[in-house]
Amino acid sequence: MPSDQDFLDFCRKLIHGSGLGPTSPSYMRLISLCILLPIALLMDCLIIYDFVYTKNDIFKFAELLESLSSYGQLLIRKFILIVHEKVIQEVLELRKNFWKYETFGEEHANYLRREMITAIRATQIMVGLVTMIVLCLCLSSITNKEKSLPLESWTPENESVKCVLYTMQVMSMIEVIYLIGTVDSFYVVMCTEIKIQFLLLKEKLRSLRSKETIECLNGLKTCIKHHNLLLSVHKKLNRIFSEYFLVQYFVSVLAACVQLYILKYITVSLEDLLKSLVYLVAVFVQVALFFMLASDIEEEAEQLADEIYDVDWESTSDPKIRKQLLFMLMRAQEPLCMWGGGMVHINRNEYIVLFRLAFSVSTLLGAKAE
């Protein structure tokens, strides 16, 4: 079974390979910023421009929204890696101060590693679904004579230009696959790490119940220091993904709404039907990864306060221990929430609300089209 450090190295390698990491070679950064980013921005402009020619064609409008949400996934992840590069590096460095999984025995460590492996496999499933979507889009553009590009956008009549745009779209979609793997893996690993550290912290507090006064006091100081470290890492992680959460919320509503509309109200080819189904599942999995993990941390942080109460601080005669416990309890009682732009609370309830909203909007669009 891999060590806990292997999971961190996995993230570092992906960020390095994106060309936007602190250790990425200059030529990779040049390719990412001076070639791939302008291509993505150009394709976004062509998609937005094509809205002028929808002419009340609801299917074309839906496909353009799908294209726009797809490029939104690319640009927001580039934004994170470019703007929050230093904060990401700080988080990765702080991760080195986390407690080892083996702190409370090898059996407990193996359980924690399985938690991490499960989370990473969920990310791999997400990347696999995105890859399937890209293949479906490319297949659809080949088999459907009416489609000249994988993603709907404004297309000139010139065949040579169409070939160039096709190549650009394929390059962008390959980059989307890689960046989803990179950014989402970083988030999943760090959130799961924070959750695991809260589990270790609770285990440490349980072990202090039978300790002598001096040993208990030293243990409490260690717990408080580690708790403050986790709060700091969580705050930085929320800072990195705050804009992403907000954009992802609306992009996911948009993407789910479009796919639900296509599935419910439009007769499409087998390729388009398959693509819509995979796309919808991918959106569900992707949003679940972000919202569920944030909610897990929130719940673990709430349970920490109960563990502090169970240390039986009221019966101790040492005022230093009581003071340390009260200080830690005050911090633990503050809700540890993830927020998107200070507006969207990232948790399970909001996850359900998101898809209810998408379903409602798609139903309204269907009623309007009829």
Which positions does each model-derived feature cover?
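Inner-leaflet juxtamembrane helices
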Residues: 77-95, 187-191, 195, 287-309
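Intracellular effector-coupling site of seven-transmembrane GPCRs
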Residues: 216-251, 322, 327-329
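C-terminal transmembrane module of eukaryotic multi-pass membrane proteins
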Residues: 186, 242, 264-268, 274, ...
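Short intracellular "coupling" helices and adjacent cytoplasmic loop segments at the cytosolic face
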Residues: 77-82, 88, 99-103, 204-219, ...
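Short amphipathic alpha-helical coupling elements at transmembrane boundaries
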Residues: 90-97, 196, 200-203, 207, ...
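Helix-loop-helix junctions within predominantly alpha-helical proteins
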Residues: 2-65, 97-190, 196-219, 243, ...
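Hydrophobic alpha-helical transmembrane segments of multi-pass membrane transport/permease proteins
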Residues: 131, 249-256
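Transmembrane alpha-helix/interfacial motif
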Residues: 60-81
